[in-house]
Regions:
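Alpha-helical, hydrophobic structural elements that either
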Residues: 1-167
Length: 167
């Protein structure tokens, strides 16, 4: 079952199981720095919970009145149904696409991982809130940000939202 180097061989058949040490602590970080993004949206990390398996991050954002007015001037008051009923736009309609594509990066904008795994990244965006899930890292840089990835090795730091400092 073991290779010469002491690691497990890949099984030929069957399933793989493991035991998770649930005694490992969950580290909770809150009240991240509020930043104003290039489109005028204010955003901050409300909480980040680092578990032995995943990092769960909740971002709060606020759309300015000027952004709302500009969006409605360009797009109308809301979605219009065939019967004429209007469902008003809310903040999730007005926030730019940036909110859907944030990933973890270091202070230089380098992504912590080359690619996101299945089920990682944005887990949902609502009016004023966005949730993200990432795989746990054994070691994080001194400062970690959420930012939209622009290339294989870079992110647009103008849109970076700092995570609360890790201790």
């Amino acid at each position: 079952m073991l290779k010469e180097d002491g690691t497990f061989r890949k099984p030929d058949a069957g399933i793989v199981s493991f035991t998770l040490n649930c005694d490992a602590p969950v580290t909770h970080y809150a009240d991240g720095e509020r930043v104003v993004l290039p489109d005028g949206t204010a955003a901050w990390v409300e909480s980040a919970d680092d578990t032995p398996v995943k990092l769960y991050v909740t971002v709060r954002y606020e759309i300015s009145d000027a952004q709302r007015e500009a969006f409605r001037a360009e797009n109308g008051e809301g979605y219009v149904f065939p019967d004429g009923t209007v469902m008003p736009f809310d903040d999730v309609d007005m926030v730019g696409s940036w909110v859907y594509g944030l990933t973890l990066v270091d202070a230089d904008g380098k992504p912590l991982r080359a690619s996101l795994g299945y089920g990682e990244g944005s887990w949902g965006v609502g009016s004023g809130v966005a949730d993200y899930v990432f795989s746990h890292e054994d070691a994080y840089p001194e400062q970690v940000y959420l930012a939209p990835q622009t290339g294989e090795d870079s992110a647009d730091m103008a849109w970076a939202i700092p995570l609360p400092m890790r201790k």
